[in-house]
Structure formats: C-alpha cells, structure tokens
C-alpha cells in the first residue's frame, strides 16, 4: 500500500474515533505533508504552547525523539561509524539508540525563560527561541486552545519571517493563529 493510501486510512480511522475532526480532515493531511517534507529534507520541528498545551508540546517532542509505536532503528552508516570510533561503546550505542525525528520543545528551557522574562519582553519568549533555533524549511507547531495566545502568535510571525512553515493546533474554528 502506498504511503498516501496508508495516511488516508489512518486519518479515516481518526475521524471515525473522533467525529468532531471531520471538518479539519484536510488540515490534518496538510499538516502531515508539511512535516513529511520537512523531515525528508533534514529539517526539524519546534513546538510551543501554554499550560496544558505546554505539556502536549513536551509529549509530542518525546514521541518524535524516540520510538512511538514502531521501532525506529538508526542507519547502518551511523552504526558503522559508532563501532569504528569505539567498538565496545559503539556496539552498545548501536543496540540501544533509536532513530529520531528532530524536534525541540520551546517550553522546557527554565534558565532562558526566566532570564528572558526578567531582562526582555516575556510574551516574546517563544519568538526568541524560534529566532535562534529556526531555519528555513523547519516547522513551527503552535498549540493554543483558543488559537489566540499572544506568545504563540508572536512565535508564528517570527517563524514565517525566517521561512519556517507554521502549523496551528487549536480548539477554535476561527482564531488568529490560522492566518499564519
């Protein structure tokens, strides 16, 4: 089965389980396509949100940086390099490292966050991190139940200015985040 058919099957199953998602089925597929393209091109995902959405950001990153449902092995070329550098340690690393989809949560930097809140404009903390970490072709995922969280909106604008793609995960049909 080709990837597109598999994706559609998964999306249909998702909508079957959660019928409220029917109206955003095309958006889910578009978000997948953005992420697939970014990862295929060696890019990364930056994720931010507030409160419960911050927890979601951390969880998403955790699942991408290690196996989720299926094992993701590291590439054989990396295994060869590991063993060449140090046979014993390289073998342990080769046996236990997991393939990762590069992702960074912007909510888990207490030193930067508190310094920025003390010395700069607190609402710009995610935008500052996007500015420092983001590169053209990367993806910014802003999670906001309302879709109107100012710090997430500023980060989306910063992301667009640097050539990142922006995905908004919101709970509201109409919101400010959808314009980015």
Task: List where the protein language model places each region.
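Cofactor-binding loop segments of dinucleotide-utilizing enzymes, especially the Rossmann-like FAD-
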Residues: 50, 108, 145, 171-172
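A short, well-structured juxtamembrane/interface segment
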Residues: 22-41
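Generic N-terminal amphipathic, Lys/Arg-enriched alpha-helix
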Residues: 1-22
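Surface-exposed amphipathic alpha-helices with a cationic face
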Residues: 156-163
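Glycine-centered short loops/turns at secondary-structure junctions
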Residues: 42-43, 137, 163
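Short, glycine/polar-rich helix-capping loops at beta-to-alpha or helix-loop-helix junctions
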Residues: 168-180
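Glycine-rich, small/polar surface segments that engage phosphate groups of diverse ligands
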Residues: 39-133
